Amino acid sequence: MVNLLGEILLTVGALLFLFSFYEAYWTNLESNQLQHQAEDQMEQEWKNPRQKKNLELGEAFARMYIPAFGSDFQFAIVEGTTDDDLLRGPGRYVDTQMPGEPGNFAVAGHRVGKGAPFNDLGNLNACDAIVVETQNSWDIYRMLPTGDDRAAEAAACLSPEQVERVVAGDYSAVPGRMITLPGDVETINPIPGTTLAADPGMESLMTMTTCHPQFSNSHRMILHAMLVRSDPKTDGYTPPELESN
């Protein structure tokens, strides 16, 4: 009986090891290949002057950079948040806004395996930059305050008007980072935590969501950032946020 129990435990241990290997290594290889394919397709689309009507699920349409994570951090963002979409890279929630639009451009990404693009989101701080490159523009977002001195953190990177909205206005309840339950869908609304529809008078936000804690999907880590600048794409131009990286 003891020998049988030992064999069962060894078998279970081996299966867990194989599953961990699959999640942490093999899915990364698969995701990396799909990410490169999506990136290549996007580059071809950008070189084509014709404007596409609608994005297809899994199709890349933008590229994101987080300078705090180093110069090698860049991922093509795809349309959709299904398992297949997120295997290709970070995916846009299809009912949210596009980069630079008033409202909320919300993106989901894996934290473990499958490329793990959002593995280090917990290390970002207030005012850290998230740069989104589209076919025609560079959109620069800055992470919203995370500490107790909300006014000082906001003033370090936002305009005076944005500081007022973030400290005492309609964005005063929107944190830079929060932990919540998977069903908390209001975090990706045009103004997170409200049910307001997107409006031209709103700020342009970017929200990133991922599983929390690491190796678990019991909760979600949510990061909110606000657009501070949109630069048109011109030959040879790179935003200073990336040049200093």
Placement of each model-derived feature along the sequence:
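Solvent-exposed, non-transmembrane regions of membrane-associated and secreted proteins
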Residues: 3-4, 9-245
